[in-house]
């Protein structure tokens, strides 16, 4: 990954967290953005949030225009990527892997 793309994703992550905190909806402004992945042309960004609730993801989709407007004003950029909000399930995967490794470790200890 090139440095420019990493910088863009990092800046966008910070701006999105600020944008969510500025919203009037208590469910949205308490969300955590865990990761941002921009497309190669930087016209589209996947925003990973810690929520598996489809209702929250739907609210985020409705608020996309306000969030993009905030990002544009705060950054001074000419254009903001289109945002797609995605549930981040990496924590759940990590917990499952930890449980599997613990089972393996218990099995080796019993041998």
From Swiss-Prot:
Q: Tell me which UniProt keywords the record has, alphabetically.
A: Cytoplasm, Ribosome biogenesis
Gene behind the chain? rbfA
The protein's job, in short, is: One of several proteins that assist in the late maturation steps of the functional core of the 30S ribosomal subunit. Associates with free 30S ribosomal subunits (but not with 30S subunits that are part of 70S ribosomes or polysomes). Required for efficient processing of 16S rRNA. May interact with the 5'-terminal helix region of 16S rRNA.
Subcellular location(s): the record lists:
Cytoplasm
Q: Could you tell me what this protein is called?
A: Ribosome-binding factor A
Q: Which family does it belong to?
A: Belongs to the RbfA family.
This protein's assembly is summarised as:
Monomer. Binds 30S ribosomal subunits, but not 50S ribosomal subunits or 70S ribosomes.
Tell me the GO BP annotations in alphabetical order.
maturation of SSU-rRNA
Q: Which organism is it from?
A: Helicobacter pylori (strain ATCC 700392 / 26695)
Any Pfam family from its record, for instance, is RBFA
**InterPro entries noted in UniProt:** KH_dom-like_a/b, RbfA, RbfA_dom_sf, Ribosome-bd_factorA_CS
SUPFAM superfamilies, from UniProt? Ribosome-binding factor A, RbfA
Mind telling me which GO cellular component terms the entry cites?
A: cytoplasm
């Amino acid at each position: 990954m090139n440095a420019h793309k990493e910088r863009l994703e990092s800046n966008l992550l910070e701006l999105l967290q600020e944008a969510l905190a500025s919203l009037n909806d208590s469910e949205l402004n308490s969300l955590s953005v865990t990761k941002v992945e921009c497309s190669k042309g930087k016209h589209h960004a996947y925003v990973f949030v810690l929520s598996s609730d489809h209702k929250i993801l739907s609210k985020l989709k409705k608020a996309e225009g306000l969030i993009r407007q905030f990002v544009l004003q705060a950054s001074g950029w000419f254009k903001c990527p289109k945002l797609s909000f995605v549930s981040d399930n990496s924590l759940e995967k990590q917990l499952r892997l930890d449980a599997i490794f613990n089972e393996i470790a218990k099995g080796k200890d019993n041998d």
